[in-house]
A protein has these predicted regions:
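Family-specific signature for flavin-dependent thymidylate synthase
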Residues: 1-211
């Protein structure tokens, strides 16, 4: 399970202007904002962006200046893979260390959409145990054993929300590394990438021969 919310794409105008710095071609900028405040690439700017994006990472530095902020709720097992992307990404997460006891444990707190009946039964038993330990800890905050039981038994299917900041160059790397991954969560993220502004022009840039 993965939930992607509150997407915000920023700094298109400045990134495109910077892309024109090497040739001092600012007078050819033809982009504008629509009535909803969305940045619309003009024909000249879109052509430049596509040429640079397809020319390789050395030529498309402007993509590193197009920022994306998004809230992602996903299981810990997925976050372990996402954390391999360190360069150009920032993430603030909800804290399990400080807030694990703040709400009741429920099945919906875990990614279990692919479990069979036996797996769900095992998860339900663990959820009941975790909830029992949570109640113990809430009644007596000095009961460190109950807290340790929660922390060390929390399964990797536990869902955590993080606010993530990336850039379009990150998204190229993520998309082509993960679009055929066995985890369904990556497929959902890749679908989200495809739907971002101008992604089909400047993010989905690798030819089949390069993949």
């Amino acid at each position: 399970m993965i939930k992607i919310e509150r997407t915000s794409v920023m700094n298109f105008e400045n990134a495109i202007r910077g892309a024109r710095n090497p040739l001092n071609s600012w007078d050819r900028m033809d982009s504008s904002y629509d009535e909803n405040g969305n940045f619309i690439l003009g024909e000249n700017d879109l052509g430049l962006a596509k040429r640079l994006a397809h020319a390789g990472s050395d030529h498309r530095k402007f993509l590193r200046q197009i920022f994306v902020s998004v809230d992602i709720t996903a299981p810990l097992y997925w976050w372990k893979e996402f954390d391999t992307y360190k360069v150009g990404t920032v993430a603030n997460s909800c804290s399990t260390m400080h807030k694990i006891h703040a709400k009741s444990f429920e099945r919906d707190d875990f990614s279990c959409d692919r479990l069979d009946e036996g797996g769900l039964a095992a998860l339900d038993a663990l959820v009941a145990y975790l909830e029992n330990e949570r109640v113990k800890f809430c009644e007596d905050k000095t009961n460190k054993q109950a807290w340790h039981n929660m922390i060390q038994l929390l399964p990797s299917s536990y869902n955590q929300m993080r606010t993530v900041t990336l850039n379009y160059e990150n998204l190229i790397n993520i998309y082509y590394a993960r679009k055929n991954h066995k985890l369904a969560e990556w497929h959902t993220l890749c679908d989200w990438i495809e739907a971002l502004p101008y992604a089909k022009d400047i993010v989905l840039v690798k030819e089949k021969s390069e993949m």
